[in-house]
């Protein structure tokens, strides 16, 4: 029994550690299959799938092959960004194309020790490229011009949501060939979603035809919001919604494969409504088209090495003298499950808890409700641990009773070892007969470990993925439960509790097994050195409760045994 238990503990420890190291390899999620989609397979009313790129606008989807654009001189990129601020967003819009080139989150500091510096989500500088693009393409779309994208004008260079104001509307204007365009940004107090609308006023004598596109463009730079200590980087890449799969990932490697094989068309999906998103640690950006709209999703890598996930909406025609409007929602902010679920079905799945999501979701739900009462995530973890321990108490009690009986028959086991010596077969047979006679389950001590491991791994992913845990303080030196203990005090305490718990267990009869078991607290302490402090806190509290339970049950059984003997 002891060697089996030792092997089980070591195996689970190794498996747990490896799973943590491999988190960023997308557990349980199938990669988006590459599809060779010809232009004839596009959904009804959609422009043809992009089949190439131009030197001027490599990052913009191409219009249909018969598109022509009026000749005009190339224009230089604009350097004067339009600043827009609300209580939760601080963004900068490039007048050329109206792209959101910079976006900061004032309520989420870059670092805990510098709360005045907000986390920057979008950036289109020399060191990093990450921005949200949208425009109008098609036969008459201004963003389809080979000469360059339109340069919008604005009444001011800076806009800010005033006190007492719940909504901020910013209009960018552009006119060409008798058609007036307004690109409108609508932002609301307390919300991270931005409505991007196009108002088209056709004052020309010809029908206007085009379609809206929206995309997220990012380079291959690392995730600034993620910690890579011991390889615990979360998923950095694209994702989308389809009717058959509400959460489908498209990794950078997927786009690389298509880019390397020129015979393959870009990765495309025809969807109705849905969303496209770019994921990183704690934060997500997503374009959400109108519900019921037929769209073509495109994922690709451009010639500059940037990765793009976006969609093209249905083609629309505006008659001479008529007006039209099309829009989409851009979300750029924290992975708040409740908010994301309200925006679009399946978007909340970007909070990726891995293949144990069915355990992680209830754990997070419990944590949230406990936190609403105690107001501290550290204490929430402690009370959650107590609750879990209470739920599994019957199982733990049975296990501890089994171990107490094992301790009671330890002299008999020693006598069997002395009797049979090196004859392992007879020794094992005699041990099993003894266990049967004493009504001992030789695997009973393993059950709590087996039960705890899924909960342990699920809680790890909850702490890793939930933005609510980001920079969440506990007490004393623990100022952030989502990162490692800066002084490694909690892991050392955890190792000490494991050692104490080990003393309550029966000593393995084999000397080699005993040595291995003595090493387990040291091994686990090393594993936990770089784990999130919240996870180590859970394990420390769990061990302390286990020690109390085991001591109580063992003493109770020993007292009953002495009473029966008397």
UniProtKB/Swiss-Prot annotation:
GO terms for cellular component: plasma membrane. It holds the Pfam family YidC_periplas. It is a multi-pass membrane protein. InterPro entries: Membr_insert_YidC, Membr_insert_YidC_N, YidC/ALB3/OXA1/COX18, YidC/Oxa/ALB_C, YidC_ALB_C, YidC_periplasmic_sf. GO terms for biological process: protein insertion into membrane; protein transport. Signal peptide: none annotated. It comes from the Bacteria. Keywords: Cell inner membrane, Cell membrane, Chaperone, Membrane, Protein transport, Transmembrane, Transmembrane helix, Transport. Interacts with the Sec translocase complex via SecD. Specifically interacts with transmembrane segments of nascent integral membrane proteins during membrane integration. This is Membrane protein insertase YidC. It comes from Pseudomonas fluorescens (strain ATCC BAA-477 / NRRL B-23932 / Pf-5).
């Amino acid at each position: 029994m002891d060697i089996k238990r030792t092997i089980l503990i070591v195996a689970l420890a190794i498996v747990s550690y490896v799973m943590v190291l491999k988190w960023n390899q997308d557990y349980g999620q199938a990669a988006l299959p590459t599809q060779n989609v010809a232009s004839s397979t596009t959904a009804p009313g959609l422009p043809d799938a992009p089949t190439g790129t131009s030197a001027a606008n490599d990052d913009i989807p191409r219009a249909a092959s018969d598109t022509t654009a009026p000749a005009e001189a190339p224009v230089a990129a604009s350097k004067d960004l339009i600043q827009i601020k609300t209580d939760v967003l601080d963004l900068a819009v490039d007048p050329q194309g109206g792209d959101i080139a910079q976006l900061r989150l004032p309520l989420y500091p870059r670092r805990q020790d510098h709360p005045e510096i907000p986390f920057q989500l979008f950036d289109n500088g020399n060191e990093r490229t990450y921005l949200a693009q949208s425009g109008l393409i098609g036969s008459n779309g201004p963003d389809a011009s080979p000469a360059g994208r339109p340069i919008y004008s604005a009444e001011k260079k800076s806009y800010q949501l005033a006190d007492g104001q719940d909504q901020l509307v910013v209009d960018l204007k552009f006119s060409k060939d008798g058609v007036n365009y307004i690109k409108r940004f609508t932002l609301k107090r307390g919300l991270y979603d931005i409505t991007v609308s196009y108002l088209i006023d056709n004052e020309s004598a010809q029908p206007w035809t085009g379609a809206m596109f929206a995309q997220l463009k990012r380079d291959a730079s690392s995730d600034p919001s993620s910690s890579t200590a011991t390889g615990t980087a979360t998923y950095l890449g694209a994702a989308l919604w389809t009717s058959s799969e509400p959460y489908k990932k498209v990794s950078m490697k997927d786009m690389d494969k298509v880019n390397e094989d020129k015979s393959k068309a870009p990765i495309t999906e025809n969807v109705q409504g849905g969303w496209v998103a770019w994921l990183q640690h704690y934060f997500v950006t997503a374009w959400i088209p109108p519900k019921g709209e037929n769209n073509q999703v495109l994922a690709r890598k451009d010639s500059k090495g940037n990765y793009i996930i976006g969609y093209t909406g249905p083609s629309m025609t505006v008659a001479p003298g008529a007006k039209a409007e099309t829009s989409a929602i851009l979300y750029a902010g924290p992975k708040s499950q409740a908010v994301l679920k309200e925006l679009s079905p399946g978007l909340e799945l970007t909070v990726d808890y891995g293949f144990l999501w069915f355990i992680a979701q209830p754990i997070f739900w419990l944590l949230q409700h406990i936190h609403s009462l105690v107001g501290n995530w550290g204490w929430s973890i402690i009370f959650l641990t107590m609750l879990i321990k209470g739920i599994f108490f019957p199982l733990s009690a049975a296990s501890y009773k089994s171990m107490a009986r094992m301790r009671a028959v330890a002299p008999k086991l020693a006598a069997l070892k002395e009797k049979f010596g090196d004859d392992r077969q007879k020794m094992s047979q005699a041990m099993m007969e003894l266990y049967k006679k004493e009504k001992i389950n030789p695997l009973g001590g393993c059950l709590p470990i087996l039960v705890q491991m899924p909960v342990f791994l699920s809680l790890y992913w909850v702490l890793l993925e939930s933005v609510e845990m980001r920079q969440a303080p506990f007490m004393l030196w623990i100022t952030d439960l989502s990162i490692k203990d800066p002084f490694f005090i909690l892991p050392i305490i955890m190792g000490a509790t494991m050692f104490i718990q080990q003393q309550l267990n029966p000593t393995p009869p084999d000397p080699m097994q005993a040595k291995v078991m003595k090493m387990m607290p040291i091994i686990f302490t090393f594993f936990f050195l770089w784990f999130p402090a919240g996870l180590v806190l859970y394990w420390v509290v769990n061990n302390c409760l286990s020690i109390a339970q085991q001591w109580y049950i063992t003493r109770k059984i020993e007292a009953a045994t002495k009473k029966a003997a008397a």
